[in-house]
Amino acid sequence: MDIALLIKAAIMGVVEGLTEFLPISSTGHLILAGALLGFDDDKAKVFDIAIQTGAIFAVILVYWQKIRDTLVALPTEKQAQQFALNVLVAFVPAVVLGLLFGKAIQAHLFTPVVVASTFVIGGFIILWAEKRQERNPAVARIHEVEAMTVMDALKVGLVQCLAMIPGTSRSGATIIGGMLLGLSRKAATDFSFYLAIPTLIGAGVYSLYKERALLSVADVPLFMVGLVFSFVSAWLCIRWLLRYISSHSFIPFAWYRIAFGVVVLATAWSGVVTWTP
């Protein structure tokens, strides 16, 4: 297989791994990177599933102890049952709205103005959420995911649906949404990552079914390179972020989003990127 193509696959894997779990929208960055690398044909649609799989493996590895303990305790312990129920309840809204409106959103909302607007608006919402907790730390009433109720989980799940709008960021919506709903920065981030597991698996399986005609055994090496680089970069990114939020806010990501929104418009107006799915 062409070495240049494998290098592009590695770069795309790193982009996915570094952006999937940060509040900056992996979709927007993958579109831009794919356009700049010339890696945005039909094959890229299936490739996205491979690199997303790498990110899923990474978050499972980071949280494996909690996941394993929950599965073992699920038949007998109420806390484990409550946690599993919360993740399931938060997952359902995205499934329902995705099946109902996913095609319409892809057809009508993947435009430069929408993508740029959501980047910028999301940036200002992050600034607001962080300033709100800074002024009044008491608004963070939930400091551990185990303390969440089903209603808390449902609200986070509803907020996650906003990530269907391109440029929003799934992790950004759930983390910042969780903070605005009363979760601490750490609790919101942890729950966002737990929720990512069924959400990304569900989206991947659905996409794999839709794009099954594009699958080819010849592309396996390409997909494996992307998966491995995505896995490693996502694992490093998650571990770094969990350390970072223990003493820092998400404000730098807010300014990054605002700046990136300007980049989206500039690349679209210049014709460098078409910003279509």
Curated annotation (Swiss-Prot):
It catalyses: di-trans,octa-cis-undecaprenyl diphosphate + H2O = di-trans,octa-cis-undecaprenyl phosphate + phosphate + H(+). GO terms for cellular component: plasma membrane. HAMAP family: Undec_diphosphatase. Its EC number is 3.6.1.27. The lineage of its organism: Bacteria, Pseudomonadati, Pseudomonadota, Betaproteobacteria, Burkholderiales. This is Undecaprenyl-diphosphatase. It is an enzyme of class 3 (hydrolase). Belongs to the UppP family. It comes from Polaromonas sp. (strain JS666 / ATCC BAA-500). It is a multi-pass membrane protein. One of its GO terms (molecular function) is undecaprenyl-diphosphatase activity. One of its GO terms (biological process) is cell wall organization. Its main location: membrane. Catalyzes the dephosphorylation of undecaprenyl diphosphate (UPP). Confers resistance to bacitracin. Pfam families: BacA. It comes from the Bacteria. Keywords: Antibiotic resistance, Cell inner membrane, Cell membrane, Cell shape, Cell wall biogenesis/degradation, Hydrolase, Membrane, Peptidoglycan synthesis, Transmembrane, Transmembrane helix. It is found in: Cell inner membrane. The chain crosses the membrane at residues 3-23, 44-64, 82-102, 109-129, 188-208, 218-238, 249-269.
